[in-house]
Amino acid sequence: MAVLALHAVFGIFIYFSSVKGSSQPQARVFLTFNELQETKTSEYHRISHSPLDYRILLMDEDQDRIYVGSKDHILSLNINNISQDPLSIFWPASANKVEECKMAGKDPTHGCGNFVRVIQSYNRTHLYVCGSGAFSPVCVYVNRGRRSEEQIFKIDSKCESGKGRCSFNPNVNTVSVMINEELFSGMYIDFMGTDAAIFRSLTKRNAVRTDQHNSKWLSEPIFVDAHVIPDGTDPNDAKIYFFFKERLTDNSGSTKQIHSMIARICPNDTGGQRSLVNKWTTFLKARLVCSVMDEDGTETYFDELEDVFLLETDNPRTTLVYGIFTTSSSIFKGSAVCVYHLSDIQTVFNGPFAHKEGPNHQLIPYQGRIPYPRPGTCPGGAFTPNMRTTKEFPDDVVTFIRNHPLMYNPIYPIHKRPLIIRIGTDYKYTKIAVDRVNAADGRCHVLFLGTDQGTVQKVVVLPTNFSASGELILEELEVFQSNSPITTMKISSKKQQLYVSSEEGVTQVPLHRCRIYGTACADCCLARDPYCAWDGNSCSRFYPTGKRRSRRQDVRHGNPLTQCRGFNLKAYRNAAETVQYGVKNNTTFLECTPKSPQASIKWLLQKDNDRRKEVKLSERIIATEQGLLIRSVQDSDRGLYHCIATENNFKQTLAKINFKVLDTEMVAYMTDKWSPWTWASSVRALQFHPKDFVGAFSHSEMQMINQYCKDSRQQGQRREEPQKMRGDYSKLKALINSRKSRNRRNQLPAS
């Protein structure tokens, strides 16, 4: 197994190197939590300094509220500003249940509380809310009022049992959707956490669930998300899709593998008449694959589904399903984003069923007769208009579903490869939200990716018909003070806001902060943020309906040469010359930090008005991310250094450093005295005076020497009484005279 795992790791590294390059991409801008607060573009809300495990469970853009569940609290926050007018309900578990929970050996802090895990809109005035209830789930109706201005938020009913609606264990995911005042949940239905089910409750009809203790249906699932998706024009054909991962035993029966899955059911399923009574008769599932293919055809999987986001369109069949996947390997840490066409998912569910056959129980396509109506078809829909309920399904249809719930073909992503891969990083992706943005040169998708380190990456994905490569990390935001993992994330394209939660609180950030990219047109253009454009004065929000003549944006190429003419581009590409000194045989550092980590740096050296030549790097001359380190400085190192940054084929000079080398002997004499200028009195005893130094060193050079002497004496040297200058005075005089003669040769002749 270890050999196979290592082979998988090498396969991913080979794939990643060939497709994306060897280095991991970096964000153009990184903002810490404090820096984000200083921009005054974010809001943060919490009700306690203690972590309360916040989860954003419902966003209602019609009432301008987002609803958050946490330990013992239900929160209603203003969608425009979560810090303004927050409403909360304190809803703890009963004291008896908390005590029973502790006596059962459950965690008093992270288990024996009422962790709110279900908030669904029941009708226009009420929410239906469920919590873990200290391992005894409970549910209530909450009155939120008809309009948000009413500021109504209160529990409006007695507690009722939440069994079959919310998991007992708050650390086990519960997913749910509400349709016509009926609740559909994916959770564990028992105290011990052994009976997983997809359950319909809160219904005037009979309750329905998955077949109990049938590993063909569910095998130790961890539920991730649930969505209602139309299937054609007939509303009776709509399906509820449940996304989860489960542990499956391999054919040998000895090893359990994790597979990511999609299951679907018909909301109007009422179970079978004689078989599968009060069980789903339309339950089907298929494997969801996110993998990379090695050169030898070996497939390596990102097998653990973490989150799902549906990017809807006017046509439901063109809906895109984005998924976050991570590796289950203990050898390395990796995550990926895969994207699926809904039409491809539906094609798999309309394809062959899986069937186990032979002594090794290998999966093969089912070759027998498929009963009518096709298993998985909803009653009363386009294909079964005369069947009002699943109880009218023939027995062979129900029996087939019980024994063949799995589809043979897996569901592959677009192009059969991940959109984004991260390996060898100190983080994993945990959550995803996606926005569709109209830029000046086309439509693109912007991904907001939450990590287990409490940050959010903003990534733009360029369409494949663009000449540029697929992804760019525009920003990385530290949305929480601690490194607590992102637990939920909601996006509002209407409000242009992103809402993020972790165990410590909820943060709201806008989808764009255009001014952080810089104050020049080139900075704005190089950022390639589809939300932003240069308006002639600053980098600001881009509106596709505005006048394009005055808006400069180039997401496709990010080329300032074509977009920023007339905006002081020549001055921007140059840098003012500075002077820096180094001492022979010592180490010096020429500082040059690029504005973007996505830029590459090249150092050029120009000597005595000669042509610029690229600096040859060696063990003595080392390029770092912050500049150029020169060890054991030599006379040959003097000259004019140019630090050139290249980003997206756009070159600019970040620094011009006129590097001058001081003679070691001269500095040694000068650093011998306590006062930086007392050496002059000793020099007066010779045949020359301090004025002789005017020709040897310029005013700036003397200032540099003075500072160097001061710094040298502060490095732990013991203070000494002034004494006569030691050393060979004749050697010092010869050194100064030679320096004066060199300077005279470089001076212009008198006119």
UniProtKB/Swiss-Prot annotation:
Coiled coil region boundaries: none
Keyword Disulfide bond annotated: yes
Protein name: Semaphorin-3C
Ranges annotated as biased composition (Basic and acidic residues): 712-731
Gene giving rise to this polypeptide: SEMA3C
Alphabetical list of InterPro entries matching this protein: Ig-like_dom, Ig-like_dom_sf, Ig-like_fold, Ig_sub, PSI, Semap_dom, Semap_dom_sf, Semaphorin
Glycosylation site residues: N81, N123, N268, N465, N585, N586
Keywords: Developmental protein, Differentiation, Disulfide bond, Glycoprotein, Immunoglobulin domain, Neurogenesis, Secreted, Signal
Species name: Gallus gallus
Family, similarity comment: Belongs to the semaphorin family.
